[in-house]
Amino acid sequence: MTKALYLDCHAGIAGDMLLSALVDLGANPEDIESELKKLPLDQFKLHFQKRVKQGIHAMTLNIDVKEANHHRHVNDIFKMIDDSTLPERVKYRSKKIFEIIGQAEAKIHGMSFEEVHFHEVGAMDSIIDIIGGCIALEQLGINTLYCSAIPTGHGKINIAHGIYPIPAPATAEILKGIPIAHFDVQSELTTPTGAAFAKGLVSSFGPFPSATIQHIGYGAGSKDFDFPNILRVIQFESEFEQQDSVQVIECQIDDMTPEALGYFMNNALEQGALDAYYTPIFMKKSRPSTQLTLICKLHDKTYFEQLILQETSSLGVRSTSVNRKTLNRAFKILSTQHGTVSIKFGLQNGKIMKMKPEYEDLKKIAKTTKQPFQVIHNEVLQQLYQTYHIGNILQ
């Protein structure tokens, strides 16, 4: 079995709501604050207390901070994390969340990732929310996260660059490929930080899976509505393979260039397709052609059918709903002589069935060390199989 967490975002998600919910779930607030104070931050104090939100007792967070620097560069935050003594998985998860926000800001403002200067996200409270949340997840031993569809609210919000519609530009960019739930509330329900947590750490989105519930935590948002403005987190033991249905969309193409086909596949995957691939086939008149197969969530069927009709030369598509069974996924960080590598595990009843290092981490190490990719891959794989063993329970 593996410890997993379900984020029930019926009222949206924000960094402070998640951290509060994790403390309500059982994370130790004193230990979180102690770990955070190992970072070179201005003086601060965390205050967690219970508050009633429309009849629901939920945890809230207030941060007392004496801050001199509201705006930090992305490299400053990364260096602060890298130089710390935080656990490796906390470092990895924290940097991944900051990277997602930074990439979104870079795209919106038309600059490189290195040029991004964090505003709200660079402020102390957001740094505490992100890194503190990752510390809490580590305390609780959470390996895998799942999440409901996420509501954003609607209306307008005043941000650093002026008045913008909800969701804010960064939030909308981060939520690409994530299912959005409609909730008719004129207010911001999901922040960039909350969206980045979901984008970076959640394995899959949808209803609560078949599982044994262990603990439940409630984190309260700062706003008051006529409904409980809370994030509910549910810790459970994931015992079996995940079973669900997906949509398979196909078409045949005989008049597109390889460049155009490559562009479509990259675009579809960026938009949230679960998978896409091409198969060489022969069509009528003995023409060598290509069959496009795209796999997506059931609720994304209409969107990707339209994308295929819009972006390819095909005049039609075929769609089929199919059942699939997948192993439970979990991630751990492996420390190597070259740096840290994220390891993906496939679990069945808590036992390791598959394990492999993440390609992007290996690629980054190969580029940094200027060693052949295969050399790095083999070294990491050797250490991986010395550390973990197929058939053992993942601890």
From Swiss-Prot:
> Signal peptide location in the record?
none
Which reaction(s) does its UniProt entry say it catalyses?
A: Ni(II)-pyridinium-3,5-bisthiocarboxylate mononucleotide = pyridinium-3,5-bisthiocarboxylate mononucleotide + Ni(2+)
A GO molecular-function annotation: nickel cation binding
Q: Which UniProt keywords apply?
A: Lyase, Nickel
Membrane-spanning residues: none
As recorded in UniProt, its EC number(s) are: 4.99.1.12
Question: Please, which domain of life does this record's source organism belong to?
Answer: Bacteria
Q: Name one Pfam family in it.
A: Ni_insertion
Q: List GO BP terms, alphabetically.
A: protein maturation
Similarity field: Belongs to the LarC family.
Among HAMAP family, the record links this protein to: LarC
Q: What does this protein do?
A: Involved in the biosynthesis of a nickel-pincer cofactor ((SCS)Ni(II) pincer complex). Binds Ni(2+), and functions in nickel delivery to pyridinium-3,5-bisthiocarboxylic acid mononucleotide (P2TMN), to form the mature cofactor. Is thus probably required for the activation of nickel-pincer cofactor-dependent enzymes.
Name this polypeptide is given: Pyridinium-3,5-bisthiocarboxylic acid mononucleotide nickel insertion protein
Q: Which organism is it from?
A: Staphylococcus epidermidis (strain ATCC 12228 / FDA PCI 1200)
